[in-house]
């Protein structure tokens, strides 16, 4: 069965998606170089689909780039078709020449290409076709050759001569030099939730909580801040370029970099427009460093095993499948920003299918959004399609877009895009083996993903690091022991960046972030959204607390309080003598769609509200019905208007005619508080009257996270624990 978008998915399709499901707009499929004839010549090539599927077959560039030279020599694909036989003969001659003059010929070719960068367009199967991402039968053009891999190692070592194995490198200590007995002890502690916590203050009024497995050993010391890239264990190829784009770390960044590059889990709940690009560059640098070190280790061990064939070497350096990094993002344009960060940090001579990527993933901003808030334009600007997935493959000189998942190093996807490929339409074929060896998982803009369908996030994480159903050409003699023992999820690093933290995100932190190296949660200290109201006159903001015994019963307790204590006064104020309409302009803001349906149905059927006229706008209301409801509300024909948080998230309407605001629950996003209350001032002539009507919000102790952002960290404690009353007013 197809994975539903659900009540959390983006319901509006009018903006964004260029190319629908991400199909290219550059015409039919281009001819691909067929490797079957080459395989006949090189009969020693690996069999059983191992090429390009196993991590052990890491690309050696020499054969690949011979093909690249032929494919990039002409921009006209038709001309390439007409001259098929000639390039093939040339290719064989080059292969034979490479065998006769093995090292020198390839070295010369490397020098010739070092001064130029090329984009190669090789049309791969569509990344959203049913089978394209996961097919093992379609091996890519870059078949790996073990002899060529040996040369790639030699050249790579010359290229990165300063990169030596460092026992203090977190990559070594966390993935390679693992004490199996200590790992098992830590896993047992984590399984029983035996976390020991340390609290710390970061510059800028940020709170940090570090949790690590309490194994009874020495006390864990908080790492010192990192003040520059020189303190990080970076591959030399990255360090040479990163300094051009990542300046000296600021106070907050310097405190978090040691955890990110130390392979500890991180939940960062203070993502903003000003720091989002900095953290994006940092985690892109981190995952690139991880990919390059993983590839370098495999290549060196390949070379070692070839040079010492008689030795019984224990070379444990791989996972079950090649993909090592998963980056989950809300939109295609967000994916473009991440890819741009990657490409500016990793200087590749060639980028295959780059134009196709930008054609299908990027779009111009809507010029009519000049009056929209900055956070809205950042999230929905450009291509806001939330159905996508993309594989990136890295070789020594090339970045390859739209690589098949089992051939990819990094997978970038939306939750829905991943869910669609994991669960096929017929419900019979499931494939998530490509997630079995993920070692770094990144979730960016988690707050935006909450407004899609968070169930897809939970589903994806529940399928990370499972034992694969098929071998996919894996060399099990090279697989790390903690993969074979099913312990990979305790080694995986997870990084989550969000503008704020919700119970759902906290649940992800508790249930899916099991890193034996520890995990860190960072939250800001809030002053309160009630202090930042965009009105020229003071507005009375009242908070009414109701009792709720458990989160499960909270919806029922909230509804009961609303109908008994709030709705009765609303009905009285909205009707005059004889039941005639008297007052209008009440906006009822409802965060949850399920609560919206419940309240709407009650207002439509209850005898208590038979004289109350109202309109309703939700994320599923048609554009025509939205316009009608807004018109009737502004004219006074409707006394009340129901309005959901997700509607405001996706549309940011400016509702006119509001004279009073009732919050059925406070919004998750604190920015929405000021915007909703700001509706009271959209009609200047009635601003003073609207200010008198003010705002009334309902809350319970289970709304603590939301309330902290609205009223401020210092005020929250008294409001939750106050015994003398349940009503709190601020002006």
Curated annotation (Swiss-Prot):
Keywords: Nucleus, Ribonucleoprotein, Ribosome biogenesis, rRNA processing. Pfam families: Utp25_C, UTP25_NTPase-like. GO terms for cellular component: nucleolus; small-subunit processome. The keyword NAD does not apply. Residues 1-174 are annotated as: Disordered. DEAD-box RNA helicase-like protein required for pre-18S rRNA processing, specifically at sites A0, A1, and A2. Component of the ribosomal small subunit (SSU) processome composed of at least 40 protein subunits and snoRNA U3. Belongs to the UTP25 family. This is U3 small nucleolar RNA-associated protein 25. It comes from Ajellomyces dermatitidis (strain ER-3 / ATCC MYA-2586).
């Amino acid at each position: 069965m197809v994975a539903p978008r659900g009540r959390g998915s983006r319901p509006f399709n009018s903006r964004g998606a260029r190319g629908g499901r991400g199909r290219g707009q550059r015409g039919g499929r281009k001819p691909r170089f067929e490797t079957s004839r080459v395989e006949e010549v090189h009969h020693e090539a690996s069999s059983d689909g191992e090429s390009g599927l196993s991590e052990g077959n890491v690309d050696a560039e020499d054969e690949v780039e011979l093909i690249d030279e032929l494919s990039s020599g002409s921009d006209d694909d038709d001309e390439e078709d007409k001259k098929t036989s000639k390039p093939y003969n040339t290719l064989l001659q080059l292969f034979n020449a490479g065998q006769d003059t093995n090292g020198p010929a390839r070295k010369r070719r490397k020098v010739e290409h070092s001064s130029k960068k090329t984009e190669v367009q090789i049309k791969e199967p569509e990344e959203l076709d049913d089978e394209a991402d996961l097919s093992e039968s379609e091996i890519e053009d870059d078949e790996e050759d073990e002899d060529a891999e040996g040369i790639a190692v030699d050249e790579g070592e010359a290229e990165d001569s300063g990169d030596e194995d460092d026992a203090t490198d977190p990559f070594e200590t966390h993935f390679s030099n693992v004490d199996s007995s200590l790992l098992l002890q830590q896993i047992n502690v984590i399984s029983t939730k035996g976390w020991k916590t340390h609290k710390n203050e970061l510059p800028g009024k940020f709170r940090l909580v570090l949790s690590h497995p309490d194994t009874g050993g020495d006390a864990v010391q908080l790492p010192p801040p990192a003040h520059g890239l020189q303190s990080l264990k970076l591959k030399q190829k990255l360090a040479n370029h990163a300094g051009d784009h990542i300046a000296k770390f600021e106070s907050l960044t310097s405190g978090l970099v040691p955890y990110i590059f130390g392979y500890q889990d991180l939940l960062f709940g203070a993502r903003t427009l000003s720091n989002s690009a900095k953290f994006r560059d940092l985690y892109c640098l981190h995952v690139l460093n991880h990919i390059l070190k993983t590839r370098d280790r495999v290549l060196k061990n390949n070379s070692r095993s070839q040079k010492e064939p008689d030795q019984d070497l224990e070379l444990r350096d791989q996972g079950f499948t090649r993909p090592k990094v998963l980056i989950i993002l809300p939109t295609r344009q967000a994916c473009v920003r991440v890819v741009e960060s990657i490409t500016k940090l990793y200087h590749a001579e060639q980028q295959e299918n780059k134009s196709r990527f930008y054609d299908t993933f990027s779009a111009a901003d809507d010029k009519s959004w000049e009056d929209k808030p900055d956070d809205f334009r950042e999230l929905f600007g450009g291509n806001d399609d939330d159905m996508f997935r993309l594989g990136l493959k890295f070789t020594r000189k090339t970045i390859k877009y739209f690589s098949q998942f089992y051939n990819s190093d990094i997978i970038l996807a939306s939750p829905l895009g991943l869910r669609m490929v994991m669960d096929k339409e017929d419900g019979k074929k499931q494939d998530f083996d490509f997630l079995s060896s993920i070692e770094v998982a990144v979730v960016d803009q988690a707050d935006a993903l909450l407004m899609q369908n968070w169930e897809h996030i939970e589903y994806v994480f529940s399928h990370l690091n499972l034992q694969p159903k098929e071998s996919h050409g894996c060399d099990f003699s090279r697989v790390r022991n903690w993969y074979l023992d099913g312990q990979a999820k305790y080694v995986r690093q997870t990084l989550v960046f969000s503008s704020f933290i919700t119970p759902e995100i906290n649940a992800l932190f508790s249930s899916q972030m099991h890193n034996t190296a520890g995990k860190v949660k960072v939250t800001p200290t809030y002053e309160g959204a009630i202090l930042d109201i965009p009105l020229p006159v003071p507005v009375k903001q009242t908070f009414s607390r109701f009792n709720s015994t458990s989160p499960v019963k909270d919806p029922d307790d909230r509804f009961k309080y609303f109908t008994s204590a709030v709705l009765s006064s609303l009905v009285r104020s909205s009707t005059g003598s004889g039941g005639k309409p008297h007052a209008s302009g009440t906006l009822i803001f409802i965060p949850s769609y399920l609560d919206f349906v419940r309240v709407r149905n009650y207002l439509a059927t209850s005898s208590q509200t038979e004289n109350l006229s109202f309109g309703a706008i939700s994320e599923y209301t048609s554009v025509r019905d939205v316009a009608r409801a807004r018109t009737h509300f502004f004219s006074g024909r409707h006394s009340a208007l129901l309005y959901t948080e997700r509607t405001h998230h996706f549309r940011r309407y400016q509702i006119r005619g509001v004279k009073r605001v009732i919050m059925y629950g406070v919004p998750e996003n604190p920015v929405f508080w000021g915007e909703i209350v700001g509706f009271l001032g959209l009609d200047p002539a009635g601003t003073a009257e609207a200010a008198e009507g003010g705002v009334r919000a309902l809350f319970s102790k289970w709304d603590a996270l939301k309330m902290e952002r609205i009223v401020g960290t210092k005020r929250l404690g008294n409001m939750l624990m106050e015994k003398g009353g349940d009503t709190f007013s601020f002006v």
